[in-house]
Amino acid sequence: EKTLELGTLSGGKYANDYFGFGCELDDQWTYADEDQLLSMIQATADLIDDKNFKDDILDADMFYDMMAVYYDGVTSMNVVVQNIGAAYGALLDEETMVDETIKVLPDQLAAASMDVQSCEHVTVEFAGADHDGILTHSTVNGGDVYQLQTYVKVGKYVAVVTLSSPLEDNLDPMLGFFYAVQI
């Protein structure tokens, strides 16, 4: 079994050899640095009112591997890696993880003051392969937020790639920034 490796950033390119995908962005995007990535777990927990869910986030074996924000300040993408464990890793496939997540995601988003309009299981063509994902439409303070989460499972780890935009039409072009890397 191969060892988990963090993704690398070089110029406008992010690559994660472990999961076999990369992303190339132009200078209208800004990648978060290591300190910003570390602070994201705490910031995510701070948005949540539910103490149990907040504790779960802080205790989870998970981290942000990449985050980038478009110049508009609201369109963004991130890669969160989570250790689902050797036992669960053998049992859980992407489809099951998505189905289980959809059961709790609307409540989790509501705890972060997002009003979920729709949340559906989708197949995503991501970096040259089909993966299970979740397409969510929420509103925040009256504004639309479209999120596409793609699940990429390798061994006992899953990378969840989240694309977020106020315009649903932006999600497909954002997917196009990702490509397969040789592993």
Regions found by a protein language model. Give the residues of each.
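N-terminal targeting sequences that direct proteins away from the cytosol to non-cytosolic compartments
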Residues: 1-63, 113, 118-120, 140-144, ...
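Conserved polar/disulfide-associated segments of primarily extracytoplasmic proteins
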Residues: 35-148, 155
